[in-house]
Amino acid sequence: MRIYNSATHKKEEFQPIESGKVRMYVCGPTVYDNIHIGNARTFISFDVIRRWLIASGYEVTFAQNLTDVDDKIIKRANEQGRTAAEVATEFSDKFIGVMRAANVLDPDVRPRATKEIGPMIAMIKTLIEQGHAYAADNGDVYFAVRSDPNYGQVSGRNIDDLMVGARIEENEDKNDPLDFALWKAAKPGEPSWPSPWGEGRPGWHTECAAMVHRYLGTPIDIHGGGSDLAFPHHENECAQATCAWHQGFSSTWMHTGMLLVDGEKMSKSLGNFFTLAEVLEQHSAAALRLLMLQTSYRSPLDFSWERLEGAENSLTRIAGTVENLRWAANHATADADEAASEAFAAKAAETRATFKECMDDDFNTAGAMGAVFGFVTECNQYLEQAGDAADKAAALAAADTLVELLDTFGVELPEPKVELPLGLLGVAAGLVAYTGDDVDEAAAKILEARAEARAAKNWDLADAIRDQLKDLGLTIEDTAAGTRIKTL
């Protein structure tokens, strides 16, 4: 397996620190509002990556934090006349709920910043003791960026270049404009905790570094997030961790690309800003995931409602193929062609191999989905050629292949509507004098009568059958593998 490392700008052979085990951390949200689909793109991408690592046999420990104390949370609380804790609790719950609605697996560990103040203070004390941080007279504590000779290793930025044309907040309490806050002195009305430097709260970058170390240990195998976090957040995380504990922070850094809407940056002012909850009210989680899978996680993703509708249609097509394969397997009336069956079975094995090859190449979901779509076409061609002589084992194996590969991605196919109503017994009694109580047998008798009526050009009877079925919410579908009654 090869993974693109954002820090080295190249694909590298993935070698976990501990054989067979992967420790993985992805930065969670600052919980002051509902997450938008750009945020969701990152979380869904890493959910797919995590699922593939698990499918590949790794024992994955996945941690994701909730930043529940931050300037944005405090600002929102003040605007609404609420406490920061109330705002954070509301949007933490909403985040967890919408992630589950999007079929994103819960993390193994979900630490909340406000519950981890002790480890953060301990890390800051260590940094001060080792000369990498200092306390200002006003109660703030800052990381001394120039004390870290490796600063810039995550983002590839040079310290001197950062000073050229950079928008750096002037702060007379800092020794250097590049230094960043590890601890912020308390302000009136803001949440705070006691510390050796007085009442205050942790800086954002401090939170993740301390939580990674506490719950996963360092170094970890994979640290991920959106590309906008590479600098300064991930750079500053890494600087603190490596200076505090004198070991690597993450073997591999992974970052997802930006999400665009109809080719433009998402913005409330442009009217193209959508929350994940809003999207899931109109479309399935599977369709949204399928849309995202068709672009590399590292590349910009262009979202549009038309593309999302197209993804829904693709799901319906795949689900229909799976349904047709299973139906053909259970309703074949002639002997299957052995050579054709073997060739078809080989196509399924080839699809699985191509899928794995793509996913092992930096999680190339676009290539993997290309293999799936190609196999769907081959399945439909096989059914058309086989007619009523489909090979049961090969057809069922093909259906399982499609379902299992998509399940690896967390894509659930829509359930086919196959349960026939008891009212069909009455239709069969009136049309073909059927007196039994087996709905499936009644359906078969009706189809026989329709076939005979069409052969005899008795269009009145054929139309009567169609109309009475329609009244029950049913229709007759003619496929290459045969004819069946299904729900509308």
Regions found by a protein language model. Name each.
Residues T275-L488:
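Structural preference for alpha-helix termini/caps and helix-kink/transition segments
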Residues D106, A136-N138, D478-G482:
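Short Gly/Ser/Thr- and Asp/Glu-enriched loop/turn motifs at secondary-structure junctions
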Residues A77-A84, D108-T114, G198, G226:
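The substrate-binding groove and active-site-proximal loops of carbohydrate-active enzymes
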Residues L66-D71, S92-F95, L105-M120, N138-S147:
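Short, glycine/charge-rich beta-strand/loop segments that flank catalytic centers
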Residues M1-Y32, D47, G118-A328:
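Alpha-helical recognition segments enriched in aromatics with Gly/Pro capping
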Residues T8-K11, I17-L105, G482-I485:
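N-terminal, positively charged nucleic-acid-binding surface of large information/translation enzymes
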Residues Y58, H132, L474:
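Short phosphate-binding/catalytic loops that engage adenosine nucleotides
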Residues I54, R100, I128-E129, M254, ...:
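Alpha-helix C-terminal capping/helix-coil junction sites
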